[in-house]
Every structure is written in C-alpha cells, then in structure tokens.
UniProtKB/Swiss-Prot annotation:
Organism this protein belongs to: Arabidopsis thaliana
Family: Belongs to the ATP-dependent AMP-binding enzyme family.
Gene: AAE13
Additional remarks: Plants overexpressing AAE13 show increased sensitivity to exogenous malonate.
Cystines in this chain: none
Protein name (record): Malonate--CoA ligase
GO terms under biological process: fatty acid biosynthetic process; malonate catabolic process
Keyword hit for Cytoplasm: yes
Stored PROSITE patterns: AMP_BINDING
Job description of the protein: Malonate--CoA ligase that catalyzes the formation of malonyl-CoA directly from malonate and CoA. May be required for the detoxification of malonate.
Expression by tissue: Expressed in flowers.
Induction comment: By abscisic acid (ABA) and osmotic stress.
Subcellular locations according to the entry: Cytoplasm; Nucleus
GO molecular function: malonyl-CoA synthetase activity
Pfam annotation, one family: AMP-binding_C
Length: 608
C-alpha cells in the first residue's frame, strides 16, 4: 500500500486542517524543510509503521513577535503586564519591547568597538538581515531584550553559554560567523577579548528599566518602528548549537516560522495562559530553556521568573513562598515548573534532608502548582514515582530535540504513562523506521513537524542526509510504540543501544531498573568493547550517601557486582545484567544534565 500526499503552501502558519481516517495521513505544509526536499512526495509503508496525532494543531492568530508589537497598541492590555522577574525586579512587556527597539536602533550607529582590531563589517538597521548576532547574558530581561532587538533588526540570534570555555565560544562564534557580540556589563571584559579574537564587534546590552522605575507610554512608537527588513517568516531567526553528545556540535537554524509554530503548539498542548507564572532555572542556549520555559510562555503572555542558577533550597523556598501552609495564595505564586531529571533527583535529595515540618510545608506547596514537566533526558521510573509520592505530581514527560524542539508529549489531561514520552503533538507526524532484523517493532524514530529546523549551518550535505526521501527528519533515536500508542525512547542509536552477544539492548532500560536499587543514587550504563560478546554491559554507579556511609562503617564495599546482579536477576533478562561495575563519586554531565556517553566510552576504552 502506498499513501500519497501533497504539501500545500501556507501563509503565516495557516495550517492545513482536515480529518484523519484509517487510510490517510495529514502532512503539514512546511517551507522549513531544506530546499532539496520536493514539495510533493510519495512514500511507502514498507518497513515502516505510521503514527500520527488524533487531531491537528489549530493555529491561533498572531506570532511571538506580534505579542511584543501589541504591547505598544493603545488598546493593548499587555503593555504594563509583567513579562519577566529577575533579581527581585519586574519588567513589563512594554519595557522589554522598548529596550529591544533601543537595541535595534543601536545597530544604526557605528559606535561599537572590538578593541581596535579589524572587524567583520555590517551596516546597521535593515542590512542586518541574516547577520548572526551572538548573545551572552545570564537569564535576565537583558537576554530577552537582546534576542528581540536582534529580530527587530532582521538579524539571527545565536545564544551562547556562559559556561562555555573560551575555545568553545570561539569555535561557535567562528563557525556561525558572528559579526556582533552582545553582552552585559558583568561579562563585558571577557566578551570584549573574545570578540576581538573572533573579529566580531562588541556592544553592551543596555540595562532594561524595571516596572517600578519607568512607565512606558504604550502608544509612543509608530508601527513602522517594527518594519525593519528581515522579519520574513522563512528567514533564519535563531541558531542553537547541539550539545554534541553524539558528535561535534552543529548549528541548528530555526526560522520565524518554526519558532511561531512551536510556541503555538506548546501553548495549546499544555494550556499556557496569561495566568501562568513560570519558575525558570534552565540554560538559555538549549531549546528546553528557550522554547518550553521562555518563548512559549511569553507568547501566552505568562510571567517568567528567572532564578540565576539551579538551587535546590531556592526552588523549594520559592514554592513555599507561593503557597504558605495557611492556604493563602500569594499574588505572584508559581504555577508551572519544568526541569531535567537530574534536577528532580536533587530536589528529592533536598526534600529528604529537611526536618518533618519543612517537608510538610514543602510538599503542601508543591502540590499546588498547576503543572510540572521533565525532559532533555530520560526520566527514571523511580524518580517519577518518588516525586509523585512527595508532591502528588506525575511529571509530564515529552520528547524533543534541537532540530524540531518538541514533537511528542504525554497528555496534560489523561494518562501519563511512565517510561514513555506520549504521542505526537497536534500537527506533528512520526513514524518508526523498523530494523528488518528486529521482531519487536524497534527502529529509528522519524519526525515531520511545522517546527522543523531549516538546515544545519554551513552543512548542506549533513542536512540532506538527515532527512528521508519523503521529508521526515531522522532523529537517530531508537524507539518503539507501546500498546497504547505511546512512544518509548530506547536511546541514541550511537550511544544508548548496545550490541551484546547478538542482542540489541537499551542502556536506558537497564539504567532505569538499576536506579530502583536502594544503594544507587545515579547510574550510567554503556557498552564497552568485548572480544567475546561484542560489547559488555558496564554500569557506573554513584551511591546514595546514607547507604555509602553505612557500608563504609561496616568496612564493606558500597556494592559489589555480584550483589547488584543478584538483586537485578528477577528484573532483567540474564543477557541484560551488567558484567562490569564501576563506583564513582559523580558523573560528568553537561548543562542539561546529560552524560556524553560517546566521549565517556572512548575515555574508558583508552584506559584499558
């Protein structure tokens, strides 16, 4: 059987809406795919299983940029609405827009500096169309204003991590050919030096005035203030670099179109509204922190409160402040929190270290939040269950990548199945490209979405190779679909799938099981080269502190391989049991809590 569909053009994210039936597949038109992909395609279901959302995304009017443009309408109620809270200060949508326009107008002036070095040339407002603008700032109103100012000027925002070492910053700046680097006063000296080394200009982001120090007249700017060149929908707007866990970081180019479609999709799926108040403690150079916790909330006119960095005590305290035990909700109560699994592990550890009274007030407060989500890496079942027992929240797991942001989610309302990432979001199509030798329906997950990236920066061949002939993005993740139609992620084909004695094993499945052991606080499983079996299941364990102390007091090792396998033999098939065990103090994680297994495996094998 062959299904044929035509991709029709659409204007400003007007999505195709038609009914799905048993023998038709709805494909969203998308100018976001690389231009090498045809507008009309046919595909066969040979070797594939097809799945799609039960309904298509119903677009709302407007875009993220128009939210801020509306802040300057006389009839708008958004101008004075608080958009950002940071460092004890509040910033309205109007003040953010005013600052962004001020930044865009600075590009008109030739008053930037790069320390006297020769620079890459640009000519200001309008001619910034397509120019890459690096932004280095802590989570703040200034960061948001820097991104918006870049977009108002037709530029492409490239968020850079404060945690990057100089060599990595220079690599990203040179790879993306950044012509202007924006930063704040607290990082100015370092960033001036780096800008000079890369040949980019440097400019300070002007401080954003806060809501108590200045009131913005909502009608002070004319509409033509927003009419800079470059805001065409399919123009590049954002380059986010991949984390590099499976190879060299690549620049992923998103357009205004893909950004708009994604924020609308998330707003609808998770019911973000202007009544929501987000507590944000994620990095802003990854899509989780950018889209789920910033762009989509701002599109919904929510309030985003930045914590300068992840703090166990700070998060529990902020929740308790929001919902005191006397049940009197405050005016600025947190309603939504999203984090990575490692954060929830640390929050559980912090909770367990509290006295009984503090535990009661903390659990009471956490239960009052509307929504808690987890992503960026697999959520171990024990963590999900323990969090639910403490807070009453079954964490909402979803599935995303830099290339398409979010594609699947457990439902906001309905069964959230542990160990799964739910079903495709409205407007997203997914399929499993099955391995011919696998009888369990396991294969590579492929995705088509209106939020798909445009291309990998300066890597046309890699971009082309990343798509199937019918325009689906090949994620590189192995997965299957369970009996409820929910997707189960088994891990990266290159890092989490081990080949042991003829079996293909999921490291994530084994990790999730080992984490149920009371001695195991964290764990990483990977396959190390083995002459007899191809790869050996190797477990790296970080012990739970109390269990570790107890065993040390007894002059015993924290845990032995025999003890671990003896405990796990009733939970895992014999060929899935670890044959090697390493006890470490900590795991090397990146800013999103991920372990670079490819590099870790290489390092361990080089030591042998």
């Amino acid at each position: 059987m062959t299904a044929t569909t035509t991709l029709k053009s659409f204007n400003y994210l007007s999505l195709i809406n038609h009914r799905l039936n048993h023998n038709s597949y709805a494909i969203l038109s998308s100018p976001l795919l690389p231009r090498s992909h045809p507008a009309s395609t046919s595909f066969s279901n040979s070797g594939f299983r097809f799945f799609q959302s039960n309904h298509l995304f119903s677009s709302q009017s407007g875009s993220l940029m128009e939210v801020f443009k509306a802040a300057f309408s006389e009839a708008s109620n958004s101008c004075d609405r608080i958009a950002i809270k940071a460092d004890g200060k509040s910033y309205s949508y109007g003040q953010l827009t005013s600052s962004a326009l001020r930044i865009s107008k600075l590009f008109l002036k030739d008053d930037t500096t790069n320390g006297g070095q020769e620079t890459k040339k640009y000519e200001g407002f309008g001619s910034l169309k397509g120019a890459r603008i690096g932004i280095v700032a802590k989570p703040s109103a200034e960061f948001v204003a820097g991104v918006l100012g870049t977009w108002f000027s037709g530029g492409v925002a490239v968020p850079l991590a404060l945690s990057y070492p100089e060599a990595e910053l220079l690599h990203v700046m040179n790879d993306s050919d950044i012509s202007l680097l924006l930063s704040t006063e607290d990082h100015s000296e370092t960033m001036k030096t780096i800008a000079a080394k890369s040949g980019a200009r440097f400019h300070l982001i002007p401080p954003v005035v806060n809501s108590t120090s200045e009131t913005v007249a909502c009608n002070q700017f004319q509409d033509d203030s927003f009419e800079a060149e470059g805001k065409f929908l399919d123009d590049p707007a954002l380059i986010v670099y991949t984390s590099g866990t499976t190879g060299k970081p690549k620049g992923v180019v998103h357009t205004h179109n893909s950004i708009n479609s994604q924020v609308r999709m998330l707003t609808e799926a998770w019911e973000y509204t202007s009544a929501d108040h987000f507590l944000h403690c994620l990095p802003l150079h990854h899509v989780h922190g950018l889209f789920n916790a910033l762009f989509a909330p701002l599109y919904a006119r929510s309030l985003v409160e930045f914590l300068p960095k992840f703090s166990v005590s700070g998060i529990w305290r902020r929740w308790r402040e929001s919902y005191p035990v006397n049940d009197e909700k405050t005016n600025d109560s947190i309603t939504v929190f999203t984090g990575v699994p490692t954060m929830y592990t640390r929050l559980i550890q912090g909770y367990e270290a509290m006295d009984k009274e503090m535990q009661d007030s903390s659990a009471f407060a956490a239960r009052k939040l509307r929504l808690m989500m987890s992503g960026s890496s697999a959520l171990p079942r024990p963590v999900m269950h323990q969090w639910e027992s403490i807070t009453g929240h079954r964490l909402l797991e979803r599935y995303g990548m830099t290339e398409f942001v979010m594609a699947m989610s457990n439902p906001l309302r309905g069964a959230r199945n542990a160990g799964t990432v739910g079903k495709p979001l409205p407007g997203v199509e997914a399929k499993i490209k099955e391995d011919e030798n696998d009888a369990n329906g396991v294969g590579e997950i492929c995705v088509k979405s209106p939020s798909l990236f445009k291309e990998y920066w300066n890597l046309p061949e890699v971009t082309k190779e990343s798509f199937t002939e019918d325009g689906y993005f090949k994620t590189g993740d192995a997965g299957r679909v369970d009996e409820d139609g929910y997707y189960v992620i088994l891990g990266r084909n290159s890092a989490d799938i081990m080949k042991v004695g003829g079996y293909k094993l999921s490291a994530l499945e084994i990790e999730s099981t080992l984490l149920e052991h009371p001695t195991v606080a964290e764990c990483c499983v990977l396959g190390l080269t083995d002459n007899d079996y191809g790869e050996a299941v190797t477990a790296i364990i970080i012990a739970e502190s109390a269990a570790k102390k107890r065993r040390e007091d007894e002059s015993k090792p924290v845990i032995t391989l025999e003890e671990l396998c003896g405990w796990a033999k009733d939970k895992l098939a014999p060929y899935k049991l670890p044959t090697r065990l390493l006890i470490w103090e900590s795991l090397p994680r990146n800013a999103m809590g991920k372990v670079n297994k490819k590099e870790l495996k290489k390092s361990l094998e080089n030591q042998e």
